[in-house]
Regions:
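Helix-breaking motifs and short loop linkers at transmembrane-helix boundaries and internal kinks
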Residues: 34, 66, 87-93, 231, ...
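Conserved MFS/SLC helix-loop-helix module at the cytosolic interface between two early adjacent transmembrane helices
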Residues: 53-92
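Helix-to-loop junctions at the C-terminal end of transmembrane segments
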Residues: 55-67, 251-263, 347-348
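Intracellular juxtamembrane helix-capping segments at the cytosolic ends
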Residues: 108-120, 304-317
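C-terminal transmembrane helical hairpin of 12-TM major facilitator-type secondary transporters
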Residues: 265-309
Length: 387
């Protein structure tokens, strides 16, 4: 296993922790800053929008840079953003700090995925991307529950200080072991933008948007759902987040292998499973053990899609891998924002936390429809890999 993949996974762990840990700390942040749970949920939306907006601009701004230099600069922005989160004096400053942190997110994962795929033979690309994204799933296995526990014990700001420390270690690792690609072709802006033509590419992005919307409609409000519906204590929420993280990790590994097998077939099955497990939580969420089992299966289904979606979008934009890969991360976070908004809308309109899983299931069905349309378009275009 190349050491570079391990360092990329560590970087993904740091970024994933700061993105997702806010969900476990939502009640704490809301109470400390004197805002409602839905208002605190906008910190998730703000981060996601920061990724969506920053991703294409950062990708284009670093297009002429060697990929190693770009990743180092992006990790530096990440560290600064988390420093600002740790010292934020109020809700507005924390929101701004979250957006600053988010600016590096899309481009880092996009460029990092291209680097990861370039380190292995072509028939193992999805598995290599999955290995990098293992850092993201481990952020949910370890980073989110430990960060939540730390935030509950020592204040939510302490969690962001811990993320800063991890970011510094990741930055050093990138500098030391990431290979310099001296044969990298200099990017041509016109060629990069031309790669965005075609219905298939935009359908592939829509798959990512609806998938992420489904996932985050539920994930954003999982802590209050567990506490208020299932009756789990704050300490118990940490344990459930750990279980969800294990499911995400398992799904990521399985998803990488499935994507190397048959891309579209795998995604169809994954989105069906995501829709079913999301809907099931509407009823299983009333009791502890059924809720835990459902959330584990839901998490496995959710992250099984990630490596497949990343490889799928590059299939439609081979002439600009950095840009299209980064745009896919941006699409993921557009979906993140959409999902958090939909979940908050459901709650604000009096439908209750138990209606959120049904909304998530509906969004998963939209991802399934987009997948079928994308596969059809791929067959028409002769892109066998995507179909």
């Amino acid at each position: 296993m190349p050491a570079s993949l391990i360092v990329l996974a560590l970087s993904a762990f740091a970024i994933g922790t700061t993105e997702f840990v806010i969900m476990g700390l939502l009640p704490n942040v809301a109470a400390d800053l004197g805002v409602s749970i839905p208002s605190a949920g906008w910190l998730v939306t703000g981060y996601a929008l920061g990724v969506a907006i920053g991703a294409p601009f950062m990708a284009l701004a670093t297009a002429h840079w060697p990929r190693k230099r770009a990743l180092l600069a992006l990790m530096g922005i990440f560290i600064v953003g988390n420093l600002l989160c740790a010292v934020a004096s109020g809700y507005d400053m924390l929101m701004l700090a979250r957006v600053v942190t988010a600016l590096c997110h899309g481009a880092f994962f996009g460029i990092g995925a291209v680097v990861a795929a370039s380190l292995v033979p072509e028939n193992r690309r999805a598995s290599a991307v999955a290995l990098m994204f293992t850092g993201l799933t481990l952020a949910n296995v370890l980073g989110v529950p430990l960060g939540t526990a730390l935030g509950q014990a020592a204040g939510w700001r302490s969690t962001f200080w811990a993320v800063v420390a991890i970011g510094v270690v990741a930055l050093f690792g990138l500098w030391r072991v990431l290979p310099a690609d001296r044969n990298q072709t200099r990017a041509d802006l016109r060629q990069e933008l031309l790669a965005l033509r075609g219905l298939g590419f935009w359908l592939a992005l829509s798959m990512t948007v609806f998938f992420a919307a489904s996932m985050f409609a539920l994930f954003t409000y999982v802590a209050p759902l567990l506490q208020e519906v299932t009756g789990v204590s704050p300490r118990g929420v940490t344990g459930t987040l750990l279980l969800i993280g294990l499911g995400l990790t398992l799904g990521n590994v399985i998803g990488g292998r499935l994507a190397d097998w048959r891309l579209a077939t795998s995604l169809v099955g994954i989105f069906v499973a995501l829709a079913l497990t999301s809907a099931a939580l509407r009823w299983t969420g009333q009791a502890f053990l059924p809720a835990e089992i459902t959330l584990f299966l839901w998490a496995a289904a959710a992250f099984a899609a990630v490596p497949a979606l990343q490889i799928n979008v590059v299939t439609f934009g081979k002439d600009a891998p950095n840009l299209v890969s980064t745009l896919n991360i941006g699409a993921f976070n557009v979906g993140n924002a959409l999902g958090a908004w939909v979940g908050g809308l459901v709650i604000d309109h009096g439908l209750g936390l138990t209606a959120v899983p049904l909304a998530a299931s509906g969004l998963a069905l939209l991802a399934l429809i987009a997948t079928l349309l994308t596969a059809s378009q791929a067959r028409k275009s002769g892109l066998a890999t995507a179909s």
